[in-house]
From Swiss-Prot:
Function: Quinone reductase that provides resistance to thiol-specific stress caused by electrophilic quinones.
Name of the protein: FMN-dependent NADH:quinone oxidoreductase
Domain of life: Bacteria
Subunit structure, interactors included: Homodimer.
Natural source organism: Kineococcus radiotolerans (strain ATCC BAA-149 / DSM 14245 / SRS30216)
Pfam family, one: Flavodoxin_2
HAMAP family for the chain: Azoreductase_type1 (MF_01216)
């Protein structure tokens, strides 16, 4: 059966645009038929533990002699790997927090990026599998603007999911999400609303076709 792994990381449980867009994707996916199943992991409501030992970055065979990371954390890493390997599509809600991904999402990436297991040349069981990244950004980071290049969220996800894991990364983006809140951004309200609607439409289209 076609299976979706749906991850959210926004701390905003009421008005998050990344959550709204990932929900639109997941709802459209389910609407394709009963066989289209979903596993939802909320990284904010149920945060993962940071690595307790640096050797957790490595598979057991590559760890230093005497290394003994907590067994329960190795078991959690194995569970997270099983979740992503079971998915035909991975959906990642990734709001931009202080110019990068939320720390809760970064921990998930750390658990996934284990050289020789899911990541690295010759060990990419997820190669070619679609990953849909929903990026919501409070401001704008247009080419040629003073803030060009300040978004360090999407590049991280492209490198880890795309380059290291070999996944086929699709990015759905909505900007100016703070225009309704900050008076100094009022001129961007119309743009923010239009980008949000476009992101919803793009997510639904991907959910129908992937």
């Amino acid at each position: 059966m076609p299976h979706l792994l749906h991850l959210d990381s926004s701390a905003d449980l009421a008005t998050s645009r990344s959550r709204a867009v990932t929900a639109a994707f997941a709802d459209t996916w389910r609407a394709r038929g009963e066989e289209y199943t979903v596993t939802h992991r909320d990284l904010h409501r149920d945060p993962l533990p940071h690595f307790a030992d640096a050797e957790q970055h490595w598979p057991a065979a590559a760890r230093r002699p005497g290394a003994n990371p907590p067994a329960e954390q190795d078991a959690l890493t194995a569970t997270l790997h099983a979740e992503v390997l079971a998915a035909d599509v991975v959906l990642v809600g990734a709001p931009l927090y202080n110019y990068t991904v939320p720390s809760t999402l970064k921990v998930w990436l750390d658990h996934l990026h284990i050289p020789g297991v899911l990541a690295g040349e010759g060990s990419q069981p997820l190669a070619g599998r679609p990953a849909v990244v929903v990026s919501s950004r409070g401001a704008t980071y247009d080419a040629g603007s003073p803030t060009e290049g300040w978004d360090h969220g999407v590049p991280v996800l492209r490198i880890v999911l795309g380059n290291s894991l070999g996944m086929d990364v699709h990015v759905v983006q909505t900007s100016a999400t703070l225009a309704d809140r900050l008076p100094e951004m009022a001129a961007l309200k119309e743009r923010g609303a239009a980008e949000f609607q476009a992101a919803l439409a793009a997510a639904r289209e991907l959910a129908r076709t992937l």
